[in-house]
Amino acid sequence: MQLEVSDLFFSYDETDVLKSVSFCADRGERIAVLGPNGVGKSTLFRCLLGFLEPKRGSVKIAGRDVRDYSRRALAAELAYIPQSYSPAFDHTVLDSVLMGLSAQLGTFDRPSRAQAVRAMQILSELGIAQLAERGCTRISGGERQLMLLGRALMQNAHTLIMDEPTASLDYGNSFRVM
């Protein structure tokens, strides 16, 4: 799978945020997008995910425009960890990780026992299995960031897009994530 961004432009009102952004990324390749606050990194990620429509240019996965993907097909290709997350409901950490399957299963389908076991394995690997039954509004910012990583891993997409994934993490967890 190749992610290809070509001559991407995006503006908020009349303010250009992205100007002629182009790059390619192959499966397994790690790319860091660096820059000061407000430069457009999150906007770029939203364009990659098809959340925002660029003014000009294209985003393609394996030669196909992201706008041509169904939600389910795009979820198989891209998983996203936002830089901040304010949960609207107090789902458990385990349920929040299992939500990584919602694009594949459908909103109201229940995960299988094997999927729940896999979610617990992911929480264990991230060092937060003890939080599985805790409400996600009652965990720290760093624990919430690890939960979001778990959700993205549960999604099992080909490409992981992380927007400041270590901002809330301590040094040890930051090192493990990267």
Model-identified regions with their sequence ranges:
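Conserved structural motif at the start of ABC-family nucleotide-binding domains
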Residues: 3-5, 18-20
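The feature captures the beta-strand-to-loop junction immediately N-terminal to the Walker
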Residues: 34-36
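Helix-to-loop junction immediately C-terminal to a conserved catalytic motif
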Residues: 49
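Conserved ABC transporter NBD signature motif
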Residues: 57-65, 74
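Conserved ABC ATPase "signature" region
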Residues: 98, 113-131, 156
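Conserved ABC ATPase signature
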Residues: 135-139, 143
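Catalytic Walker B motif of ABC-type/P-loop ATPase nucleotide-binding domains
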Residues: 160-164
